[in-house]
Amino acid sequence: MLVRRVPAGPATSAMMGFTDRGDGDFRVDGPADGLDLLRKQTMAGEWTWLRQAHGADVVTVTRLGEGRGASADAAVTTVLGAVLAVQTADCVPIVFTGDGVIGVAHSGWRGIVEGVLPATVERMRQLGAGNLLATIGACIR
């Protein structure tokens, strides 16, 4: 797992982690046995993972683990210790940080056409984010 700490606002930061096949099977529809343990071993905390729909729906997480399994393509939060997860292959993960707000988006061509990135930024602004930093993750194409 590749882990990187990025600024999330004055005196705060967020950790980003990117996995590959060598880290195990993190698929939402993958084998349930051991999946929660694998997640906890990779990054501690209550995970919010999404059932990506290739659209522009954004989940706002107000407590640890809220929105787990929601049908959406982005999640945002101000909750310290929250783990927001999206899964990608040929789509691109985008991580946003700013002013104590973090967000993550699953960004494929359908989601981009639907407006997932502006929707994520708008939701973050509603939570108080001003200056934003966007980090583009890896994909297979």
Give names to the regions the model predicted:
Residues 1-141:
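Active-site microenvironment for binding and transforming phosphate-containing groups
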